[in-house]
Design a protein with these regions (language model features):
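Cyclic nucleotide-binding regulatory module and flanking cytosolic helices
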Residues: 6-58, 103, 108-109
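Cyclic nucleotide-binding regulatory domains
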Residues: 61-123
Length: 268
């Protein structure tokens, strides 16, 4: 009897089974292009991204309409959008170029459900989109998400106030150079796929003025123009022609989001 049990045990000796190729394989960590998403600690990032959809941004797509309820907020990952304000019967003027370092839906952070501004896609790309109610819920329940988004509000306030000063004090050439440098930073590319019409609207000036100034920059070898395309050839020289406002805006953005000391000068 014992022999039979031993023989049975030997015949059914445990051998390692071949592994399922998919078993034990970890999904590679996703790379997030949006700066705000990247800055969140892992638990908060997982909570936020878990409520988001990955969506395409199409040219001239309206992401936010003035004085209408906000259904979604966006964390752009690629491309660029233009946040604009209106002044009576005049054409809208850009108050912020929004890219992969930004967030669309600031009123939701502040407890509002409508925005006084429009936001339209200028350069196609992708974004993480979250429903307005889901974002409000996360802001209330996760202090890290709340703190980061409030810091972003601070950066945006500095951006808007600096633009007001720039538009009233500096020449068209300085302002255009500033706009190109900020667009290059938002897109993380030396190539800016926009028309003179878009730039004229962004700066609140006539298109003829943009065409003349851009022609001068091209003649000096600082940029190269194509069909709805601008390439920055000499960023250093463009910075020399620009006012200091682009540095103030970009530095304030970084310092606001990096802030660990509330007494630190944001735009130092």
């Amino acid at each position: 009897m014992l022999r039979n049990e031993i023989a049975c045990t030997r015949s059914f000796s445990l051998r390692p089974l071949p592994l399922d190729p998919a078993q034990g394989r970890k999904e590679p960590p996703r790379h997030f292009a949006n700066d705000l998403i990247r800055r969140l600690p892992d638990p908060s990032r997982s909570l936020l991204v878990g409520r988001c959809d990955d969506v395409r941004l199409k040219p001239r797509q309206m992401l936010q309409e003035r004085n209408l309820p906000l259904r979604y907020a966006y964390f752009p990952e690629q491309g660029a959008a233009s946040l604009t304000a209106t002044a009576g019967n005049c054409l809208p003027v850009e108050i912020q170029t929004v890219g992969a370092k930004d967030f669309i839906g600031i009123p939701l952070i502040l407890g509002m459900r409508v925005s006084p501004h429009r936001c339209m896609v200028q350069v196609p790309g992708r974004a993480l989109r979250i429903e307005a109610e889901a974002l409000i819920e996360l802001i209330k329940s996760d202090v890290e998400i709340e703190k980061l988004l409030l810091r972003y509000v601070q950066a945006t306030l500095i951006h808007s106030s600096q633009l007001a000063a720039c538009n009233s004090r500096h020449s068209l050439q300085q302002r255009l150079a500033r706009w190109l440098l900020i667009a290059e930073d938002k897109l993380s590319s030396h190539e800016i796929p926009l028309t003179h019409r878009c730039m004229a609207q962004a700066l609140g000036v006539r298109r003829a003025g943009i065409t003349t100034t851009m022609g001068d920059l091209e003649a000096r070898g600082i940029i190269k123009q194509g069909r709805a395309q601008i390439e920055l050839l000499d960023k250093a020289r463009l910075e020399e022609l620009s006012c200091n406002c682009h540095r103030v805006i970009l530095t304030a953005h970084k310092n606001s989001l990096d802030a660990t000391n509330p007494w630190r000068a944001i735009n130092a």
